[in-house]
Amino acid sequence: MSYRIDRQTYAETYGPTVGDRLRLADTDLIIEIEHDYTHYGDEVKFGGGKVIRDGMGQSPIANAEGAVDVVITNAVILDWWGVVKADVGIKDGKIYKIGKAGNPYTQEGVDIIIGPGTEAIAGEGMILTAGGIDAHIHFICPQQIATAIAAGITTMIGGGTGPATGTNATTCTPGPWNIYRMLQAADAFPVNLGFLGKGNSSQPQGLIEQVQAGVVGLKLHEDWGSTPNAIDTCLSVAEDYDIQVAIHTDTLNESGFVEDTIAAFKNRTIHAYHTEGAGGGHAPDIIKLCGQANVLPSSTNPTRPYTVNTLDEHLDMLMVCHHLDPSIPEDVAFAESRIRRETIAAEDILHDLGAFSIISSDSQAMGRVGESIIRTWQTAHKMKVQRGHLRDPQRPGVDHDNFRARRYVAKYTINPAITHGIAEYVGSVEVGKIADLCLWKPAFFGVKPELVIKGGVIAYAQMGDANASIPTPQPVHMQPMFASYGGCRTTTSVTFMSQAGIANNIPEQLGLQKTVLPVGHIRQLRKADLKLNDYLPHIEVDPETYEVRADGELLTCEPATVLPLAQRYFLF
């Protein structure tokens, strides 16, 4: 005889189901579960008197015979492809199945087998997302990595050698010797890492040797001279080796204007960093790049979202990061040319329209490495408050925020993965990918993950006093777990490398301990390949007023005076 349970009790026991809604932290964003892969009456849950016991929800099947290593039960998955409720099975460090977990001898429809070798993670009432990808890292200090993973970032791509003056300003690891040292250092960290070489050269040989040394891409930066010739040379090398090029264009327009830079691209794929321009780039109209089909445009988080404090803090940040002198008028003028309220306001709206595709940090170089996810959801919230409901083109009648949430989560997960040729391995909650996952309490969504799972093992978690009798006594804060230590660290994280570097046996020559995976399928990319963020507007910028128009429509919004995901979450 079946037993009926009211919706509230069901949600409290097994987590929300189809039709239930969750608020994302203290934002105004509301998501609704669209599908439930678990079976009513046959749900699995761990605990005393619960379902995952031998002969009930746990089978006698060994791992070698098909049982998974880890099961996450009854989680709400939020990813670019949808909002669903499911169990998630992890096997050999990868996502094995998204569906219904349990014991096939006692339950129907089981596609994730729980056995005596299966660990359980309770996902009831929790939100599961892919680990974040930050594709604009200045590797200024190793302490950034702990801050990033504690915030939910599991993959970091960028350049640098430490707090060198060049690294403070540019995301480049220049030359084979420096590249080798950073690749060796990567073994020490529980995140996936990939390094960008210096792309500024009018001749190819100095770029080719960096690609063959193992970088995942090349970075063109104006502080090294982003001239049309350097751009053309760098992209030509990238075409030969199937790697990405990231660019920070010429703010001062010394070697040409934005139209000259676009011409130098020759319709070849490129990742445009901080495409609005406050982080650097042709003043005042670098934002036009987001209308180019071959340009994969990103933002960095200090301008996310536009607030009453944004302009003031940017000037001081810029002076420090780019080695400028406040006593030199030309340096001050350079800084002021980059900070424009009109283009920053337009950037908010272009993100909401899906014209800007990626959000990253610009860590310690005008950006905060632990705030990319926070700033993404603050932008989504601000846009809902100011622009209202975002219509889902596939389901125009719904009144929840699933489409907006999917668009924004894609900006720091699948889209940077696609852009840098690693989407085969990471960037989404999909079968076959590395199990880099974040589990969030809805009240803390986007701010403080409850667990960060790296390659199927918990790497960071909210943990209380280690001397307490239970895990929860205060002070509770994010702490490294076992995937952050010893050999587990090198088996649950990877280093990304160019195909040329792997062919040159760089991993063996350097004695790298991490698995090394090749980047690829990059040079044919277009903005249309980026998920839910592929809008190509025609952008016009008034050179006198800096007003921005997209397809003829003026883009402007007010700065926020208060934001969610902010001080109330960091009182302790």
Curated annotation (Swiss-Prot):
GO terms for molecular function: nickel cation binding; urease activity. It catalyses: urea + 2 H2O + H(+) = hydrogencarbonate + 2 NH4(+). Gene3D superfamilies: Metal-dependent hydrolases (3.20.20.140), Urease, subunit C, domain 1 (2.30.40.10). Its cofactor is Ni cation. SUPFAM superfamilies: Composite domain of metallo-dependent hydrolases (SSF51338), Metallo-dependent hydrolases (SSF51556). InterPro entries: Amidohydro-rel (IPR006680), Metal-dep_hydrolase_composite (IPR011059), Metal_Hydrolase (IPR032466), Urease_alpha_N_dom (IPR011612), Urease_alpha_subunit (IPR050112), Urease_AS (IPR017950), Urease_asu (IPR005848), Urease_asu_c (IPR017951). Keywords: Cytoplasm, Hydrolase, Metal-binding, Nickel. It is an enzyme of class 3 (hydrolase). It is found in: Cytoplasm. The modification N6-carboxylysine is found at K219. Carboxylation allows a single lysine to coordinate two nickel ions. Its EC number is 3.5.1.5. Pathway: Nitrogen metabolism; urea degradation; CO(2) and NH(3) from urea (urease route): step 1/1. Ni(2+) 1 binds at H136, H138, K219, D362. Ni(2+) 2 binds at K219, H248, H274. Substrate binds at H221. The active site is at H322 (proton donor). It comes from the Bacteria. One of its GO terms (biological process) is urea catabolic process. Binds 2 nickel ions per subunit. One of its GO terms (cellular component) is cytoplasm. Residues 131-572 form the Urease domain. Heterotrimer of UreA (gamma), UreB (beta) and UreC (alpha) subunits. Three heterotrimers associate to form the active enzyme. Belongs to the metallo-dependent hydrolases superfamily. Urease alpha subunit family. This is Urease subunit alpha. It comes from Thermosynechococcus vestitus (strain NIES-2133 / IAM M-273 / BP-1). The gene is ureC.
